[in-house]
């Protein structure tokens, strides 16, 4: 297997995009890449993107560790494994069996369909309530054939306008140029890839030297639900942060998604996240 520093243009581009948004400098000189093949054939270069982003995350964590007195570290990333981790649910097993025991991840309500005007929309009914709302709107059975027939009744813009009004997880497939001209795309392009906001109270609790993990002593309240938010909080927990996940005792989720995003966290069950969020956050500890 070929091992080298980050040299692939897309890997470097992803790394530098994150690095340029940070308030401190990071360096990829101590990162090695195992150039393993992609695990899926796709025109989307997800593996190289993942390598760049995960390398930047590793550099950031290593920097924070050194600031807090931990020794410098090196990092080796496997390109194929980085791609797998973008869909880490497939790496979870229970008593030797994959936790993805059914077809929920590839059900017809998770798909891309052609509209009346020849464009395409993508929908994702990953959680039960999202699936049910999509089925109610399209008034169809949960099959690819039924979804395609229902989607073809309207134009892409008509469907997206309805989706916005009804809070449905659906959007039009757009080119990069179309996204740049769209209000949402323009707003995104106007902001840095990472935003930092402060409450002007950060000096009340200053972290000292770390003994074992770079983020030990960091306290996090997680009020997110789906995938991205829990995944981010899981990354913090992996590096030593004390993460409390607030969730209802009986929730609308899919077991593999919940398990994948809950490693290393404490679970606080509440019937209302709004009530939990209004609590003085220090009372959780």
Predicted regions and their residues:
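Alpha-helical scaffold elements within enzyme catalytic domains, especially in hydrolases
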Residues: 162, 235, 260, 283-284
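Glycine-rich phosphate-binding loop and adjoining beta1-alpha1-beta2 segment
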Residues: 241, 245-271
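Acyl-CoA thioester-binding alpha/beta core of soluble enzymes
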Residues: 1-250, 278
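A structured beta-alpha segment of the ubiquitous adenosine-cofactor-binding alpha/beta core
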Residues: 266-285
């Amino acid at each position: 297997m070929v091992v080298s520093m980050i040299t692939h243009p897309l890997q470097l581009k992803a790394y530098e995009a994150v690095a340029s948004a940070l308030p401190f400098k990071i360096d990829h000189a101590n990162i090695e890449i195992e150039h393993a093949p992609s695990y899926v054939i796709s025109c989307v270069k997800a593996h190289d993107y993942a390598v760049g982003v995960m390398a930047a995350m590793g550099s950031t964590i290593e920097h924070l560790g050194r600031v807090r007195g931990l020794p410098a570290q090196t990092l080796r990333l496997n390109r194929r494994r980085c791609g797998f981790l973008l869909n880490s649910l497939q790496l979870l097993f229970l008593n030797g069996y994959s936790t993805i025991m059914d077809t929920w991840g590839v059900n017809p309500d998770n798909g891309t369909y052609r509209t009346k005007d020849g464009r395409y929309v993508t929908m994702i009914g990953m959680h039960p309530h999202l699936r049910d709302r999509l089925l109610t709107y399209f008034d169809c059975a949960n099959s690819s054939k039924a979804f395609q027939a229902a989607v073809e009744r309207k134009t892409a813009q008509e469907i997206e306008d309805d989706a916005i009004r009804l809070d449905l997880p659906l959007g039009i497939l757009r080119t990069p140029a179309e996204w740049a001209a769209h209000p949402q795309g323009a707003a995104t392009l106007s902001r840095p890839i990472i935003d930092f906001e402060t409450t002007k109270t950060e000096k009340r609790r200053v972290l000292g030297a770390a003994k074992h993990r770079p983020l030990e002593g960091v306290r996090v309240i997680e009020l997110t639900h789906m995938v991205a938010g829990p995944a981010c909080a899981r990354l913090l927990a992996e590096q030593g942060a004390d993460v409390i996940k607030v969730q209802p005792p009986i929730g609308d989720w899919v077991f593999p998604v919940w398990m994948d995003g809950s490693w290393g966290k404490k679970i606080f069950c509440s019937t209302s996240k709004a009530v939990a969020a209004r609590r003085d956050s220090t009372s959780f500890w």
